[in-house]
């Protein structure tokens, strides 16, 4: 390692808590030359935290093109590691040819974001999509015997309604707004 160099982080595949075991013999027999890519989140965080304290690391570069969507909780942990790195007063730069919502969430922690001239950003937000089947089930004369207690019991709504109840809308909007924050 030279006296001063940036650390390039290029996660490949989804962020996982533990990578899958791949049997080398099965890999050989199948004819594949590599296993499905995954990035161990714990190891990634350890590397970023160590780089923050290493005087030879001058910057953190996030190359996010091959990162697969992994969920908000893992993205938030990765983002917290980036924030800790920034306390070392070293710049963080993010780059991708295309930013999905998760990639842009991570890039937003950087000091600078670069996008390919022919690239794009796709932000969809967080939402809840459910199908409702009451009319179809009525036509099929399907009958249900449902017992429920309380207002926020919406598990059976797709079978008993054609739309979301007000109580369900209120409950779901609370947790979606908490995630979208």
Predicted region positions:
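Small-residue-centered hinge/linker elements
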Residues: 1-181
């Amino acid at each position: 390692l030279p006296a001063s160099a940036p650390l390039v982080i290029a996660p490949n595949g989804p962020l996982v808590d533990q990578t899958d075991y791949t049997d080398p013999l099965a890999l050989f027999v199948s004819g594949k030359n590599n296993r499905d890519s995954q990035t161990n989140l714990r190891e990634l965080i350890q590397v970023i935290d160590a780089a923050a304290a290493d005087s030879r690391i001058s910057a953190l570069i996030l190359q996010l093109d091959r990162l697969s969507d992994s969920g908000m909780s893992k993205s938030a942990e990765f983002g917290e590691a980036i924030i800790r790195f920034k306390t070392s007063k070293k710049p963080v730069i993010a780059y991708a040819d295309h930013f999905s919502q998760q990639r842009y969430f991570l890039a937003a922690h950087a000091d600078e974001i670069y996008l390919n001239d022919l690239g794009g950003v796709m932000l969809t937000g967080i939402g809840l999509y459910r199908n409702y089947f009451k009319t179809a089930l009525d036509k099929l004369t399907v009958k249900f015997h449902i017992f429920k207690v309380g207002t926020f019991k919406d598990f059976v709504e797709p079978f008993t309604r054609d739309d979301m109840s007000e109580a369900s809308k209120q409950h779901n909007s609370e947790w979606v707004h908490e995630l979208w924050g």
